């Protein structure tokens, strides 16, 4: 088959991408996934290609659909918490917190201060662990094996601490409506502080392993560029939106819990090292966010109230039957905004409707635009930069 020659991409003002090539070949339709290591789960992409150039990549979903929203209509409010763990199973604490905030808003109940601090600590630990998986698997997708080992080595320390606090390494069922399943162990703060001191130089070393790797930079810089206005129109959030240069983080722009009391930055690319909106920018945002999460954890350790006389279940309702009404609450998860819309009829102990707004689903919806005009090998870099979890996409 003849090569496609040089390829030129032109993005018009209405965001239509025009592909111009010196040579053309017969169009082929290739199926990538659902059993493919670089799709990070059971995702299938139907790719239309002209030689090595992708003209369209259509995602096909639903292979991991488990009826989450229907389950919610048939169980009590507290029984939904374990199901939220199984959406983004790499960031269960964050998902539990988003759901708990929604129901607590519906019930209009006040949460003890120590509970809020513990929630933020375990959520930020889970955020770091999730970003380590994203960075490690992204590296191995592009042929760099050592960073993968470094990421999973340090993630193990975090999982051990979360297991120490909650009893589980994943699928925690720890953040309850109104409180926590248990208080943290007596020297939890000391151990977390020691981890922060240990991990900060390791995070810098990990970042240098990739950003100073010429092959990694060439595989990601200028690939899968998404302009800020288009990202906003798609409804992107999290590192995907910030990678396009939009400084939007719910912890800062629509704060919840104790985040207004904490000092941290919202990193966005400046265009000096990467092309704003490309795969490399999205990777850099996740790497920089790890340091900000460490800052948040340090502040929480210093400010957390004493455990004297503390009952983690003091504000947990014995029976939950909210008054008739509806609520929407959202939180900044590692992959973006996770929101819950809950509708109560005032009679049942189960919600009439519980709708989950998944950041992974919304971010993945731009795959056609991201992939148009790219080379087939670059699809791997683009998918990895989105950092999807199919459990949350399909629900």
UniProtKB/Swiss-Prot annotation:
Keywords: Cell inner membrane, Cell membrane, Membrane, NAD, Quinone, Translocase, Transport. InterPro entries: NADH_Q_OxRdtase_suD, NDH1_su_D/H, NiFe-Hase_large. Gene3D superfamilies: Cytochrome-c3 Hydrogenase, chain B. GO terms for molecular function: NAD binding; NADH:ubiquinone reductase (non-electrogenic) activity; quinone binding. It is a peripheral membrane protein. The keyword Iron does not apply. It is found in: Cell inner membrane. It catalyses: a quinone + NADH + 5 H(+)(in) = a quinol + NAD(+) + 4 H(+)(out). Its main location: membrane. One of its GO terms (cellular component) is plasma membrane. It comes from the Bacteria. Its EC number is 7.1.1.-. NDH-1 is composed of 14 different subunits. Subunits NuoB, C, D, E, F, and G constitute the peripheral sector of the complex. NDH-1 shuttles electrons from NADH, via FMN and iron-sulfur (Fe-S) centers, to quinones in the respiratory chain. The immediate electron acceptor for the enzyme in this species is believed to be a menaquinone. Couples the redox reaction to proton translocation (for every two electrons transferred, four hydrogen ions are translocated across the cytoplasmic membrane), and thus conserves the redox energy in a proton gradient. Belongs to the complex I 49 kDa subunit family. HAMAP family: NDH1_NuoD (MF_01358). This is NADH-quinone oxidoreductase subunit D. It comes from Chlorobium luteolum (strain DSM 273 / BCRC 81028 / 2530). The gene is nuoD.
């Amino acid at each position: 088959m003849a090569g496609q020659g040089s390829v030129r991409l032109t993005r018009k003002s209405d965001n239509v991408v025009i592909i111009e090539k010196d040579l053309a070949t017969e169009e082929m339709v290739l199926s990538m996934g659902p059993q493919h290591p670089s799709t990070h789960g059971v995702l299938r992409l139907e790719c239309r290609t002209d030689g090595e150039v992708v003209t369209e990549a259509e995602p096909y979903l639903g292979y991991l659909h488990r009826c989450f929203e229907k389950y919610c209509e048939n169980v009590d409010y507290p029984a939904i918490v374990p199901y939220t763990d199984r959406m983004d199973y790499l960031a269960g604490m964050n998902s539990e917190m988003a759901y708990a905030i929604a129901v607590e808003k519906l019930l209009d109940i006040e949460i003890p201060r120590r509970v809020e601090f513990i929630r933020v600590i375990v959520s930020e630990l889970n955020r770091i662990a999730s970003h380590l998986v994203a960075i490690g698997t992204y590296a191995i997708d592009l042929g760099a094996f050592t960073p993968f080992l470094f990421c999973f080595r340090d993630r193990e320390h975090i999982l051990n601490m979360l297991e120490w606090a909650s009893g589980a390494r994943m699928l925690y069922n720890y953040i309850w409506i109104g409180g926590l399943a248990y208080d943290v162990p007596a020297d939890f703060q000391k151990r977390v502080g020691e981890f922060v001191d240990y991990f900060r130089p390791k995070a810098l070393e990990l970042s240098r392993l990739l950003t100073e790797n010429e092959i990694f930079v060439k595989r990601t810089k200028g690939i899968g560029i998404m302009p800020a206005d288009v990202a906003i129109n798609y409804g992107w959030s999290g590192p995907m939106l910030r990678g396009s240069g939009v400084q939007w983080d719910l912890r800062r722009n629509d704060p919840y819990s104790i985040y207004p009391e904490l000092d941290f930055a919202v990193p966005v690319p400046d265009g000096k090292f990467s092309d704003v909106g490309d795969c490399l920018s999205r990777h850099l945002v996740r790497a920089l966010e790890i340091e900000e999460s460490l800052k948040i954890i340090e502040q929480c350790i210093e400010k957390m109230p004493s455990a004297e006389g503390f009952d983690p279940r003091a504000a947990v309702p014995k029976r939950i039957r909210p008054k008739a009404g509806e609520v929407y609450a959202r939180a900044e998860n590692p992959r973006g905004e996770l929101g819950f819309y809950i509708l109560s009829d005032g009679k049942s102990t189960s919600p009439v409707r519980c709708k989950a707004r998944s950041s992974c689903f919304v971010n993945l919806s731009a795959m056609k635009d991201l992939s148009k005009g790219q080379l087939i090998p670059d699809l791997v870099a683009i998918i990895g930069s989105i950092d999807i979890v199919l459990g949350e996409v399909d629900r």
